[in-house]
UniProtKB/Swiss-Prot annotation:
Originating species: Bombina variegata
Name recorded for this polypeptide: Bombinin
Residues with PTM Asparagine amide: N24
Main location: secreted
Function according to Swiss-Prot or TrEMBL: Has antimicrobial and hemolytic activities.
GO biological process: defense response to bacterium; killing of cells of another organism
UniProt keyword Secreted present: yes
UniProt family annotation: Belongs to the bombinin family.
Tissue expression summary: Expressed by the skin glands.
Lineage of the species this protein comes from: Eukaryota, Metazoa, Chordata, Craniata, Vertebrata
Keywords recorded for this protein, A-Z: Amidation, Amphibian defense peptide, Antibiotic, Antimicrobial, Cytolysis, Hemolysis, Secreted
GO cellular component: extracellular region
Localization per Swiss-Prot or TrEMBL: Secreted
C-alpha cells in the first residue's frame, strides 16, 4: 500500500539523482 509507494518513490528519486549526477 502506502509503504510500497513510498519505497518506490524513494528509489525513483535516488535513481533520478544518480542519473543527473552522471549526466553532468
Amino acid at each position: 500500500g502506502i509503504g510500497a509507494l513510498s519505497a518506490k518513490g524513494a528509489l525513483k528519486g535516488l535513481a533520478k539523482g544518480l542519473a543527473e549526477h552522471f549526466a553532468n
